[in-house]
């Protein structure tokens, strides 16, 4: 036994894959209730439409920004009750991954981390707008990523980070 630290183990940790969440923040947020206050006097029979999008951007070095955009439109009958949109973003330190793992991390793993924050922001806005709570169902980002990857392969495209 020696009192000297194992420098080889430290070197391996520094050179191996690394993932670290640096910051989560709201990049953009909006809420519109175009038919209020009249909409509050109507029978509530909502239909919900959800649009979801992600984008990634390499910042300096091994830092990446991932932005998850959720747009929710709720109609009551033929009228728009409300529209809410949130861009939930995160900055991640990611290094030591091959291209496939990096693409999956940015396209599925990071959005999965951001989704609960976006869902909570949307629910809070809806309730503050005096509408019933809107708890969005979980999203399978791995399946969405696999579908997008298949679509890109069929189109002859390759995933890129801007």
Swiss-Prot record:
GO annotation, biological process: protein folding; protein tetramerization; protein transport
Compartment(s) of residence: Cytoplasm
Primary location: cytoplasm
SUPFAM superfamilies, sorted: SecB-like
GO cellular component: cytoplasm
GO molecular function: unfolded protein binding
UniProtKB keywords: Chaperone, Cytoplasm, Protein transport, Translocation, Transport
Protein family according to the UniProt entry: Belongs to the SecB family.
Quaternary structure annotation from Swiss-Prot or TrEMBL: Homotetramer, a dimer of dimers. One homotetramer interacts with 1 SecA dimer.
PANTHER family linked to this entry: PROTEIN-EXPORT PROTEIN SECB, PTHR36918
Job of this protein: One of the proteins required for the normal export of preproteins out of the cell cytoplasm. It is a molecular chaperone that binds to a subset of precursor proteins, maintaining them in a translocation-competent state. It also specifically binds to its receptor SecA.
Protein name: Protein-export protein SecB
């Amino acid at each position: 036994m020696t009192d000297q630290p194992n420098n080889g183990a430290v070197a391996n940790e520094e050179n191996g894959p690394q993932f670290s969440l640096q910051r989560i923040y709201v990049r953009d947020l909006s809420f519109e209730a175009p038919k209020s206050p009249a909409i509050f006097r109507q029978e509530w029979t909502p239909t919900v439409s959800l649009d979801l999008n992600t984008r990634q951007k390499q910042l300096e070095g091994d830092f990446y920004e991932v932005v998850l955009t959720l747009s929710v439109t709720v109609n009551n009958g033929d009228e728009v009750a409300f529209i809410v949109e949130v861009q939930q973003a995160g900055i991640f330190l990611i290094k030591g991954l091959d291209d496939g793992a990096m693409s999956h991390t940015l396209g599925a793993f990071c959005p999965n981390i951001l989704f609960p924050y976006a869902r909570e922001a949307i629910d809070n806005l809806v309730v503050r707008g005096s509408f019933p709570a809107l708890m969005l169902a979980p999203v399978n980002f791995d399946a969405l990523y696999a579908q997008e990857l298949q679509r890109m392969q069929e189109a002859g495209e390759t995933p890129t980070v801007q």
